[in-house]
């Protein structure tokens, strides 16, 4: 028995930081969107018990430091499972890029292993486990288009975003999300990330309106640390993107276009140096 699962990356169409919480996390409000770029995971039962994880395509730890491994251990303990699993993770989503790849992988592991081990957790039960693993893991379970609040775990499904083209540009370095949040100070970004304006633009379905509502309160923080992020945005706009925004805490920047063919044209015109460029589009399971 082999179960295959796809773990889709995400972008934040808006990201606003509302303040620091008593638990040390930051209160956020975000419009989150799944994209077609994905990792692939394969799961096989292991009667001898134990969990093994093999990673291809990225230099990631295969043990307890890996979120997929921790997701498997958490579900195994919560479900009282004695059997084990052999997991193969094939990475396509860039690591430490602001695209939520690790969280998506963990969410995919919860769903697949819940089926393979027959642990019987409901979607709500899996959501509770996902919250224990990380702020973005619950969205990895939901997917599509969603408004996220709290530290990112309180989700409201939104009207689905229309299919839009995306050019992802990842510079040759990673960014620490914790470091970016530590450096955040209110008022750094003159343009407010307006989630409600984005929700209205998505309902209207016009790519230019959606592009006009893009906003990320963390962008000025990362740009101060890594000015290359601002240069990537500039080059994407010069190449013809309708809008450009840093994904999450960075350093990946995405250029938004009306469709996939337009994204390919922007990628071809982009003045590339040493960045990784990926062309993809938004994804919604209901479209």
UniProtKB/Swiss-Prot annotation:
Q: Which domain of life is it from?
A: Bacteria
Task: Please report a single Pfam family linked to this protein.
Answer: GHMP_kinases_N
Q: What is its EC number?
A: 2.7.1.148
Write out the catalysed reaction: 4-CDP-2-C-methyl-D-erythritol + ATP = 4-CDP-2-C-methyl-D-erythritol 2-phosphate + ADP + H(+)
- Pathway(s) it belongs to: Isoprenoid biosynthesis; isopentenyl diphosphate biosynthesis via DXP pathway; isopentenyl diphosphate from 1-deoxy-D-xylulose 5-phosphate: step 3/6
Q: Name one GO molecular function term.
A: ATP binding
Q: Does the keyword Cell membrane apply?
A: no
Which residues participate directly in catalysis?
Answer: 10, 136
Keywords associated with the record: ATP-binding, Isoprene biosynthesis, Kinase, Nucleotide-binding, Transferase
Q: Which GO BP terms apply?
A: isopentenyl diphosphate biosynthetic process, methylerythritol 4-phosphate pathway; terpenoid biosynthetic process
Database matches in InterPro entries: GHMP_kinase_C_dom, GHMP_kinase_C_sf, GHMP_kinase_N_dom, IspE, Ribosomal_Su5_D2-typ_SF, Ribsml_uS5_D2-typ_fold_subgr
Q: Which family does it belong to?
A: Belongs to the GHMP kinase family. IspE subfamily.
Identification of the protein by name: 4-diphosphocytidyl-2-C-methyl-D-erythritol kinase
Query: Which species does this protein come from?
Result: Pelotomaculum thermopropionicum (strain DSM 13744 / JCM 10971 / SI)
What phylogenetic lineage does the species belong to? Bacteria, Bacillati, Bacillota, Clostridia, Eubacteriales
